[in-house]
């Protein structure tokens, strides 16, 4: 993330934090209340004890009446106990809300990814920006995570300042008696001005030094971003990935990881973090603490001299010293919070740069009219496409038309444009040149959700989630159980379904349930196919979803799929050409262009064609 050297103004800082707070309150209503209440109690309770303790010391140093001493002691115990109990209750509430906030902030990112144009979602710049946001959060919790801290510190600072002022004002109004001799000089206005200037200086210089430390820390965050990403990947992500654990053990990848982490070295001896802690960051914070100690010493001398002169009793000494130093500390906390917010504003800016990525894909208004006759005609007219940021055409001058109810197979070598063709058909991307027509109308003129609704797709990198089997098939917790069961049986999952004690209610995977079941790659593909069948859309597309199956199982599923597809238009992508023999038409892709089109027999008859070469290249492994 590139930051402006001068940073954000206070107005911009408060504006972006207000926006962030609104977003947090929207997804987690009332989320900040426990932090506010806890801060008030945390800041106010010490002053009550300070005032009561001063009264107790005054009584001890004068009349020492047992009943009065007992009264003050009981008050101190009662107030301390009540404050501790209240803080414990609020702390519990705060911890629950803190966990909720940490989880719910992910909702904003999820919502954005779900609303974002797929082209932007798939763009490398978007991925890099989101990775930077993650690294900022991992670095020191920058971004949304700090909002609860600011609420706490701001309320605590304001409450502390008001409480300290109430206990301190009499320090400057009480006069040393004239009988105190030279100590009456403490009544001179210059002493008052001097003490106030010292308080102001420490209050301002302390946060300035802390702000300098934050600034250095932020600069460091940019410098070590890649190193922190490497460390986080190997230290936190890889160990939990059980699917890669076999490779790690077999090939001793942990040694490679350790070497990589040592090479980037951001936390060890001599690392950028260590150097910053020993220089700018460490020295700035140490100097800020030293100034606070100097203030405490000067205030102690001033208060003790006034007490010695007879301005007030000895009990007030602890009251005034504690109040003045606490006043300075809370004022410094308030200013430090502002400095911290200015630093955090830059990280929030990165977050909102991501959240504010506009959707540029044209949204039409026509409906696709869920036709009962399923008469949909699709045509690619001179379509060319290249991925954002690339100079290479993934598809070039593609012309193709397929009729309703037909079976179309798309074949070709890796990188020939097969999956790109499907992405354009499903309007995950729009072509740079040419048109894709549905019933003679440019697909961009249809409502996006309506258009997407006519497709059931099983991508080669499909995803199942840790939810019940039936919910995975239906895409909803409420579904037609008979229909879901039939879809699974049609997809070849009947035997495994019968072996599942809970049937459709069986939880997939163990991430969220100890009773979850693990499914093999082939079984997962059958579930994904069942999901496509359950949707019952007029177009069904299989983008190499059976790669984890053996050739015989794949051929069986495709043959059965041809039966259950009925009058649907089916499009198949497969590297195994034998699985596509039953299709009405086969399109051969090569380097982004359709170079052959026809039936299996027609294409095989062309001995100089690409299809013939591909067919025989595969056939040699299945014939003697």
Where are these regions (language model features)?
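Membrane-integrated ABC transporters
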Residues: 1-46, 61-72, 90-94, 122-162, ...
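Extended non-transmembrane interhelical loops and adjacent amphipathic helices
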Residues: 1-18, 99-145, 224-273, 345-358, ...
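Transmembrane helix-loop-helix hairpins at lipid-water interfaces of multipass membrane proteins
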Residues: 32-89, 157-214, 298, 305-314, ...
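Primarily ABC-family ATPase nucleotide-binding module
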Residues: 249-254, 352-406, 486, 563-566
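Cytosolic ends of transmembrane helices, especially the final helix of ABC transmembrane type-1 domains
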Residues: 299, 320-357
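Helix-to-loop junction immediately C-terminal to a conserved catalytic motif
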Residues: 426
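ABC-fold ATPase nucleotide-binding domain signature/coupling loops
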Residues: 437, 494-527, 536, 621-624
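C-terminal portion of ABC ATPase nucleotide-binding domains
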Residues: 502-503, 559, 576-624
